[in-house]
Structures are given as structure tokens and as C-alpha cells.
Amino acid sequence: MSASFPHRHLTGIYGLQPHEILFLLDEAEQWIALNRATSKHDDRLAGLTLINAFFENSTRTLLSFEIAGKRLGADVVNMQVGASSVKKGETLIDTAMTLNAMRADMIVIRHQSSGAVQLIADKVDCPVLNAGDGRHEHPTQALLDALTIRRRKGRIAGLVVAICGDILHSRVARSNILALTTLGAEVRVVAPPTLMPAAIERMGAVPFHDFDAGLDGADVVMMLRLQNERMDGAYLPSPREFHALYGLTPERLERAAPDALVMHPGPMNRGVEITSSVADHPSRSAITEQVEMGVAVRMACLDVLTRRRRGVEGWA
């Protein structure tokens, strides 16, 4: 740990200072060129074991962390929960103790329950990185989104960012609100009343139920999918009606700033929260760039969180 980033784990954006977030973004910048080069290998994590323990289905995030670990030279092990003791009734604490006994040097965790990552982090001896826990947080997604915005816009402070869609069930929304407001952006959240968390203003976001009003003059428009797997009731009449009221179309995008950036954490539901013509726009869409920045951000986080274990000077 050092003054630049004095945290042992990265379980969320909450509690991070502006300079700590900016430090991680700056660290990520150095990996972008490597990832675009023909040879993409760095061996600074050689000999270290990274366990990706995903208790919830994932393709994109798991692949991104696996690529990040391997490009840094780590031995990467992906834990398949379907074949694990968790399916046989093992408690989360037992799983944490088992992982700890395997002497991993870093554990990346995704779990369907909010707070599960922190519980495991409290029980293990190595750094833990949150890859998404329930509705709580998804810190590396917020970091890669902030990096994408900074690279495309040149800054974050003073920008108006509209986060639109299923805010209620979105850990991405929560982490982005925390990161972007901490870095000086004005964050709007746009959703129907049934998909808007209560007292969202306490997080520093400005709520809108009217999609058009929320888009007015926005510098960045971030769309979120409907998380049907987290819905246990009738939150909206139908995907078709949601699209009619809250789908981002070329016409609606005209209400935002002329050079507004379009973002989406994926996976997208084309024709529901966003049309293909907007998602694939050659100059305004940054969706594929977000994926690219994700690998760089995760490489930076793996590097930073293991510096103490590797004996890097200044990281006692």
C-alpha cells in the first residue's frame, strides 16, 4: 500500500478519494498501448496465482479479467461455480476459507448477493477485487467508463452524464454515480418511477422520470439494460412500451449535446433500451471502446493491488 492507493482491496468505489480514482485511471493508461501491440505480454505477475471466483454467470467480465491476468503473466484459474461445493450447500464463509487455504495471490469475485465480496475479503489473506456483487457495486466498470469518458472528452469534471434505464437493479449505475460525482461530473439518472431507487439524490445524482428532459444537453448518455433476472414483480408493462418511453433513438439523441457520447456497459438489448443505429454510430458510440478500456483498467487494478505482495518499492 502507498499514499497513491492505500487500500488492500477494491470492493467498491465508495470511500475512494478523487486522487485515488485518478491514480487508477492513470495506471490504466499505460496498458492501452501494450494491448494494441502485436506482443501483449508483460511478466510482472509471473509466479502469482489469480483466482476468478464467479458465483454469478458472466462472459464479458470474466473474459476481461482472464485476459488481463494472463497478459500480466499470472497463473489464472477460473472457478466454475456450477461444479463447486457451493452448489452442494457450502456456506460463503467456508468457500472463503477454502480459497484462502489455496494461497491465491489475488481473488476476483462476482456474486449475486450484495456484500458477499466484502465478507470474503474479510476472511482471506490476499487482495480481493469486486467484479460485481448483487445491486451493490461494480467498481472496475465505473473505472473503465470514467477512463473512456476522459479519453474521448479530455475531462470528466463539469460534464453532464445521463445514466438511463434500470437504475434500481444496477450496480453499474451506483458505481458510476459514485465515481463520476467524485470526479466532478453532474450525474442525472433517468428511469420510470418503478425502476428508480428511493432517495437516489443522497448519492449526488439528479433524478428524472422524463427521458427527454433528462437527455437535454447531456455530454454523455449511458444506457442500461433491463435486468429481468433481478426483477421479482411487474416493474413495467412490456419491453415494447419501455422502448417507446425510454429507448435511445437517433431522434431522442438529438436532445443531448451535439457531440454527446453514447455508452452502454453491455450486454445490450437492441431495440429495447437502444437502437442499433445509435449503438453502432461510428463517431458517437464508445461501446466497443469501453470493452477495450476494461482490459486496461483490470490490468492496472491487478498490478496495483499485488504490489505489496511483490515487494514493489514504496508499497509496504
UniProtKB/Swiss-Prot annotation:
Domain of life: Bacteria
Ligand binding (L-aspartate): 88, 171, 225
Positions that bind carbamoyl phosphate: 60-61, 110, 138, 141, 266-267
Broadest EC class assigned to this enzyme: transferase
EC annotation from Swiss-Prot or TrEMBL: 2.1.3.2
Pfam families per the UniProt record, alphabetical: OTCace, OTCace_N
Entry annotated with the keyword Transferase: yes
InterPro entries: Asp/Orn_carbamoyltranf_P-bd, Asp/Orn_carbamoylTrfase, Asp/Orn_carbamoylTrfase_sf, Asp_carbamoyltransf, Asp_carbamoyltransf_Asp/Orn-bd
GO molecular function: amino acid binding; aspartate carbamoyltransferase activity
GO CC annotation terms, alphabetical: cytosol
GO biological process: 'de novo' pyrimidine nucleobase biosynthetic process; 'de novo' UMP biosynthetic process; amino acid metabolic process
Pathway linked to the protein: Pyrimidine metabolism; UMP biosynthesis via de novo pathway; (S)-dihydroorotate from bicarbonate: step 2/3
Key words, A-Z: Pyrimidine biosynthesis, Transferase
Catalytic activity: carbamoyl phosphate + L-aspartate = N-carbamoyl-L-aspartate + phosphate + H(+)
Coiled coil ranges: none
Subunit structure as annotated in this protein's UniProt entry: Heterododecamer (2C3:3R2) of six catalytic PyrB chains organized as two trimers (C3), and six regulatory PyrI chains organized as three dimers (R2).
PANTHER family in alphabetical order: ASPARTATE CARBAMOYLTRANSFERASE, ORNITHINE CARBAMOYLTRANSFERASE, MITOCHONDRIAL
Family: Belongs to the aspartate/ornithine carbamoyltransferase superfamily. ATCase family.
Function description: Catalyzes the condensation of carbamoyl phosphate and aspartate to form carbamoyl aspartate and inorganic phosphate, the committed step in the de novo pyrimidine nucleotide biosynthesis pathway.
Protein name (Swiss-Prot/TrEMBL): Aspartate carbamoyltransferase catalytic subunit
Species for this entry: Rhizorhabdus wittichii (strain DSM 6014 / CCUG 31198 / JCM 15750 / NBRC 105917 / EY 4224 / RW1)
Biological classification of the source: Bacteria, Pseudomonadati, Pseudomonadota, Alphaproteobacteria, Sphingomonadales
Gene: pyrB
